[in-house]
Amino acid sequence: MAHHIPPLNFGMVADDLYRSGQPNELNFPFLEKLQLKKIIFLAPDDPSQQFQNFVEDQDIELIHLGMDTHQNPWNPISEEIVISALKIILNPDNYPLHIMCNLGRHRTGTVVGCLRKLQRWNLTSIFEEYRRFAGSKVKLLNEQFIELFDTDLVTYNNAPQWLYLS
């Protein structure tokens, strides 16, 4: 019997939209159950070969947005990458969809935080969610990025229904 162990920092963002850190082979049976169509990978480095093989075997489209060669990996994620990720997230044709980075903390948390701004969550709630996943590794620059993020930069037509429920 296969065990269904979620990846590090796994969470459900909305219906058929998930977040986590990069999974390992122990997490693959769990991910299979999600029947993912696409994965947004936000880490600057390549995903592990095991993970790439899993994605290929499951016929999941892997979208690697984290490769920003002009940026120090310790800096916050770029606005361009966040906007690209949000455009993918706001297209219901991409669901079920999973957002991830190496540990599911900072890059993923920043994208989800900006998504929450689009949903018109208040900043206190956005930061509470970010901090829940970041733990003791909170980066104030990421919180500042989320706070100052201009949601008008994100254009979408046919967004998921849950975007309008808040």
Swiss-Prot record:
Residues covered by the Tyrosine-protein phosphatase domain: 9-162
> Where in the cell is the protein located?
Cytoplasm
Active site at 101
Q: For this protein, what reaction is catalysed?
A: O-phospho-L-tyrosyl-[protein] + H2O = L-tyrosyl-[protein] + phosphate
Q: Does the keyword Cytoplasm apply?
A: yes
Q: What EC number(s) are associated with this protein in UniProt?
A: 3.1.3.48
Gene Ontology cellular component list: cytoplasm
Give GO terms: molecular function aspect only.
phosphatase activity; protein tyrosine phosphatase activity
Q: Which SUPFAM superfamilies match?
A: (Phosphotyrosine protein) phosphatases II
Q: What are the alphabetically sorted keywords of the record?
A: Cytoplasm, Hydrolase, Protein phosphatase
Q: Which family does it belong to?
A: Belongs to the protein-tyrosine phosphatase family.
Listed name of the protein: Probable tyrosine-protein phosphatase DG1060
Taxonomic source organism: Dictyostelium discoideum (Social amoeba)
From the UniProt record, report the name of the gene that encodes this protein: DG1060
